[in-house]
């Protein structure tokens, strides 16, 4: 009798939706589902359990066929215990997510920061080698770093927290307590502050206003582009990665952002032979629109 192939499960728990994937031992996607994330510690746990059981139903495999579960989630993550703290967009102050989910489904669980998980997933899905940096342009700003297929977190786990790199001491106050951090320029929260008369989706609204000829909107978008290009430059000069992958919700702005980043990098290269030699525009890649990078990366981490 042939022994059933064990699957690896990955969950990407975000503030609005949770995505779950199942990978076979060769890393191929054999199951995927999405569902709304319910907020609050107990409901986040319940969402995670429903996602795992949903994959079991979708793949026709019992929970015992799942070798491991990895979870990518925002907030402060203790990778040793699986505890999550301060995940504010999930209305979650503290949750022993790894232990409690493992008790509910009977499968080993590992928990990781969502940006690190997305970096690993992007590295796997795009079949990259060497050193890669994943730039997450979302509500906040952070980067994940992968070296030879493994996450690099630094001595204290803060490698990649470039959102809290100050670039203007006279700039806006940052939630971290500093002033003028990159996150106050290149993030969804920065756009919301700079374009307060936007609707439910300020980033999309400000781009539409810019395209309609609004001068103020054009200045907001230009500041976002300059900040995002600065992030690429920081990652290139500090890590010298082969590729810099742009992910996060803001990437969906498309050409106004991505084309603007590349144009800015090219402009800087014209002004600096040093930057020109680094060929930064060529290193920039964009995560595809419907990519499951964070969930796939979580599955890899869980193994």
Residue ranges of each PLM-predicted region?
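A charged helix-plus-loop insertion that forms the helical arch/lid used to bind
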Residues: 82-93
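Glycine/small-residue-rich loop that forms an oxyanion/phosphate-binding "nest" at active or ligand-binding sites
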Residues: 110, 116
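Short, glycine/acidic-enriched loop or turn micro-motifs at the edges of active sites
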Residues: 15, 117, 139
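A short acidic/small-residue loop/turn micro-motif
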Residues: 36-39, 92, 158-161
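Short hydrophobic alpha-helix segments
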Residues: 33-35, 88, 155
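Glycine-rich phosphate-binding loop of actin/hexokinase-like ATP-binding domains
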Residues: 130-185
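ATP-binding/phosphotransfer module of carbohydrate and carboxylate kinases, centering on a glycine-rich
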Residues: 1-68, 78-81, 103-107, 121-131, ...
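Short beta-strand segments
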Residues: 12, 68-74, 112, 134-140, ...
């Amino acid at each position: 009798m042939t022994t059933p192939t064990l699957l690896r499960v990955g969950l990407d728990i975000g503030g609005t939706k949770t995505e779950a994937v199942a990978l076979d031992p060769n890393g191929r996607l054999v199951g995927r589902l999405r569902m709304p994330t319910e907020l609050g510690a107990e409901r986040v746990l319940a969402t995670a359990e429903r996602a795992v059981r949903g994959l079991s139903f979708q793949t026709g495999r019992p929970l015992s066929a799942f070798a491991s579960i990895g979870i990518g989630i925002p907030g402060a993550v203790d990778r040793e215990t699986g505890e999550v703290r301060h995940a504010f967009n999930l209305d979650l102050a503290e949750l022993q997510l790894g232990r409690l989910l493992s008790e509910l489904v009977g499968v080993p669980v590992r928990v990781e920061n969502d940006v690190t998980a997305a970096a690993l997933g992007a590295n796997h899905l795009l079949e990259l080698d060497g050193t890669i940096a994943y730039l997450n342009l979302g509500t906040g700003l952070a980067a994940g770093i992968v070296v030879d297929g493994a996450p690099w977190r630094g001595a204290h786990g803060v490698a990649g927290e470039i959102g809290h790199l100050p670039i203007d001491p006279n700039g806006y106050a940052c939630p971290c307590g500093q002033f003028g951090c990159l996150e106050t320029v290149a993030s969804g929260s920065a756009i919301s502050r700079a374009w307060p008369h936007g609707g439910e989706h300020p980033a999309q609204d400000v781009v539409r206003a810019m395209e309609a000829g609004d001068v103020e909107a054009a200045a907001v978008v230009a500041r976002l582009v300059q900040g995002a290009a600065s992030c690429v430059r920081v990652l290139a000069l500090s890590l010298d990665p082969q590729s810099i992958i742009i992910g996060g919700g803001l990437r969906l702005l498309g050409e106004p952002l991505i084309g603007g980043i590349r144009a800015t990098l090219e402009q800087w290269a014209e002004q600096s032979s040093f930057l020109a030699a680094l060929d930064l525009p060529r290193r920039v890649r964009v995560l595809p629109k419907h990519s499951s990078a964070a969930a796939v990366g979580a599955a890899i981490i869980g193994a």
